[in-house]
Amino acid sequence: MWRLPAPTDRPRRIERLVAELVGDDEAHAFWNAFRDRFITEQDVAELAREGFNSLRVPLNARHIADPDGWALNEEAMARVDRLIEWCRGHGIYVILDLHAAPGGQTGTNIDDSERDQPELFENEIHGAATVRLWRNVAKRYRDEWIVAGYDLLNEPLPDWFARYNDRVLPLYRRITEAIRSVDRRHAIILEGVHWATDWSIFTERIDDNLVLEFHKYWNNPDRESLDPYLRMRDAWEVPIFMGEGGENNTDWYAGAFRLYDDLGISWNFWTWKKMDTANSPLSIRAPEGWSRVAEAAGHGSPLPRD
């Protein structure tokens, strides 16, 4: 997304890079400014003009709650509140997506994990924190009608961590029970394992208000590839949702999104904006000197602060 090399491929490492470059105080000011400007009401208005009716909001547990999940970070949640207010004003439903759970649910850069391990499924400390975090989020938004549902975990467990697959549904059940203790209203959205493509973990319905989510990138957008999801939709009588798709060309988009519409599958595009791209709705121009930052990130070489 930010055209940075692998050593600096996740939020915590990018944050360290910025702090090393400008110092802790200026880094704090930078991130406050970034979070205020990266997504604004203008973005939400543009989403509505383009015909979208939902926004999937990725949340990082490290940013929105204390490490144990007991308390939410009010400064961070105020930004979520503000985004929800904008969405309400423009008729855009909000899906709250725990993209980076305590400990990491994927064990790769996308979950902001520290050691490239899905520690959420290795250490009960993180499981308990995740349950508490979701209960607090649900309690905060239980009366917010523009929130469509809670996407409990983004893309848990790629295939090389399949040994933990049998731990996903029990954790989903625990989170759902915690949410339902404070919120009976909102949908519970469950993703399969292996980049949200494998639904074999769904052996029982754990709630009466479920949505099952899959992600689709790169491979052919054809009916055959969607049949497993359609069969489960019909068998369980639940909505299904293509929660992430993109990173392709316009021909792929046209075929995929038309097919989803024809089959009654709701979908979201990933991602709304990124740097120097031709395959997202919005592209960010790289700022002057960004190539030097990327080079320093890749080689660990210091940069002068000017």
Spans of features found by a protein language model:
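Non-catalytic C-terminal accessory domains or segments of carbohydrate-active enzymes
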Residues: W290-D306
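Extracellular glycoside hydrolase catalytic/binding regions
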Residues: V131-K274, N279-E295
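Low-complexity, flexible helical/coil segments
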Residues: R16-F30, H90-L96, E224-P228, G245-W252, ...
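Active-site mouth of glycoside hydrolases
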Residues: M1-A187, G192-S200
